[in-house]
Amino acid sequence: MKKAYVVLPLVLLGFALAYFTLMRDQDKPNQATLSDVQKSAKTSPTDEVTSDKALETLIIGDPSARVTIVEYADFKCPNCNKFHQQVGKQLRTDFIDRKLAKIEFRNIPFIASDSRPAAEGTYCANDQKKFVQYHDKVFEFMWTNYYRQDNSKEFDNILTVEKLTELAGEAGLDKTAFNQCLATAKHKSSVDSDLKKSEQDGVTGTPHIIINGKAVVGPQSYSAYKTLLEIALR
């Protein structure tokens, strides 16, 4: 009889755990994996980025700089925001502003549902030749209001079309043109192209940095990036 008394509570405990697991999973956003997002991306030969093909590449710095830093990032990624604050800004000062290197920014929106409009916004901003201003404004907004304190809002729908349009206006863009660009998904194929490139480059997480064709594995300090760039410049 003692066994029966032991088994019954265990069965009840099992049901309770199953119930709370189900409820917990229902509270979580339905997150697609990076691999899923990469595979779902479709490129189109009729991409409407702009008639100026040079604007299809999102560049920070002098396009003719000797060294190219490819940065794959998601504006909703906490580590991308941390990289921007702790490494990216210093790289800009020491290498980008001095025209020694340039950053080619590639979107990889997979964290949350609002990652995608934020990514497409980079190309909308680039239409107005204000990609860098938009890029910096969105990262600063996320860091100052959220990720500087904690990462708990990672999956919340923060970067709505309305919020992105507001930030674009603060960055000096024409809000009406920007909003229309986002609303019509004008640059969907441009972001899909970024995702396809990320798959080809073996990107499995963000941020993912490539310096002159060589991937930098794992999170690194600023001094590590500085050393790698100095070697590339020799």
Where do the language-model regions lie?
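Extracytoplasmic thiol/disulfide redox context detector
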Residues: 1-110, 180, 187-200, 230-234
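Cysteine-centric redox/oxidoreductase cores and disulfide-bonded domains
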Residues: 109-206, 210-234
